[in-house]
């Protein structure tokens, strides 16, 4: 075998690398597989519509709670709509909503889409105060021109000041 190193020391080193490499590859693969359940991507309703995450895949859905969309059922279920400028998604949640949850406020729902396109949330996070919004939500809303925080005012085309 002419491609093997001639020195016994170099051959041992090559054999050691050849033995360790598959073990490290398997360890890395198992680590990534184990973490796959805890990885959750953030989407706004319009991004979720474009990306169409697989039903059952855990994601974070963020946007504003649409006015007039909150429906509380006697069995503890809550239905509401999370919206951005271009799209909206119906959300179902079983449990107690955060105290600061209300219409027109930023929210992040953690859960998955069902086969019928309804988002089933396992957790719902709301804003802390009037100035706070989760970084992902504020970034996405700023990109769409819908969020006006930090003293900004809406810019309307054709305004004469």
UniProtKB/Swiss-Prot annotation:
Topological domains annotated Periplasmic: 35-161
Presence of keyword Iron: yes
Parts of the chain on the Cytoplasmic side: 1-13
Residue numbers binding heme: 128, 132
Pfam families: CcmE
Keywords recorded for this protein, A-Z: Cell inner membrane, Cell membrane, Cytochrome c-type biogenesis, Heme, Iron, Membrane, Metal-binding, Signal-anchor, Transmembrane, Transmembrane helix
Residues spanning the membrane: 14-34
Keyword Transmembrane: yes
Membrane topology: Single-pass type II membrane protein
A cellular component term, taken from the record's GO annotations: plasma membrane
BP GO annotations: cytochrome complex assembly
One Gene Ontology molecular-function label: metal ion binding
Annotated compartments: Cell inner membrane
HAMAP family from the UniProt entry: CcmE (MF_01959)
NCBIfam families: PRK13254.1-1, PRK13254.1-5
Family from the record: Belongs to the CcmE/CycJ family.
Role, per record: Heme chaperone required for the biogenesis of c-type cytochromes. Transiently binds heme delivered by CcmC and transfers the heme to apo-cytochromes in a process facilitated by CcmF and CcmH.
Name of the protein in question: Cytochrome c-type biogenesis protein CcmE
Source species taxonomy: Bacteria, Pseudomonadati, Pseudomonadota, Alphaproteobacteria, Caulobacterales
